Amino acid sequence: YFHKVHAAVAGIFAEDIPPLLPGIPLAALMLYEFSLGLYVAKGNPKNISGIRDLTRSDVILANREKGSTSRIYLDKKLKELQISSASISGYQKEFVSDVSTSAFIINKNGDTAIGEKAVVLKTNRLEFVPLLTVPMYLVMETASLDSPGFQALIDIARSEEFRMSLHSQNCYDTTYTGELIYL
């Protein structure tokens, strides 16, 4: 951060944001919510239904890089379920996008990955096993809210045109779009 960024998009839960920027009063503008889940091959041939299936010896994971929404969720869930990452084949191999993890599965190099539903909607070779709904925020310092530029961003996020643009992509929930919360 180092006061070089005025706003950042964060696909994580609101309570996970303040520890990343300790001591800085923050505001988070809800952009949309999206479904995060498992990518599996068409027909789900290995019957993968949840995180515990990642420990099976016949399942290879295409993992995302540290700091990505998918990886943050996976690491939190593994800790919660007391599952060692060492028990997951493919955990150490990192990919930098949902598109690259999905290609790994389509090319039959792996069996599953965690990512957002939007990627699966662009191919007929994958299926999606939903795990949870994740918010996407625009995060900024509270002091910035009075700046004309930030007010313009808020106005855009609250506009019907913005909501319709998100709806047209068929994978984003705009129920809370435009809501501002203080962290």
Where are the language model's segments positioned?
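N-terminal segment of the mature folded domain
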Residues: 1-49
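N-terminal hydrophobic or amphipathic helices and topogenic motifs
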Residues: 16-25, 46-52, 79, 143, ...
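Short loop->beta-strand "edge-of-pocket" segments that line small-molecule binding or catalytic clefts
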Residues: 52-74
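Periplasmic-binding protein-like
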Residues: 33-35, 126-155, 174-181
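Short coil/turn segments
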Residues: 36, 40-46, 62-70, 142-145
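A ligand-binding cleft/hinge motif common to bilobed small-molecule-binding domains
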Residues: 4-19, 102-132
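Short beta-strand-to-loop elements that line the ligand-binding cleft
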Residues: 84-98
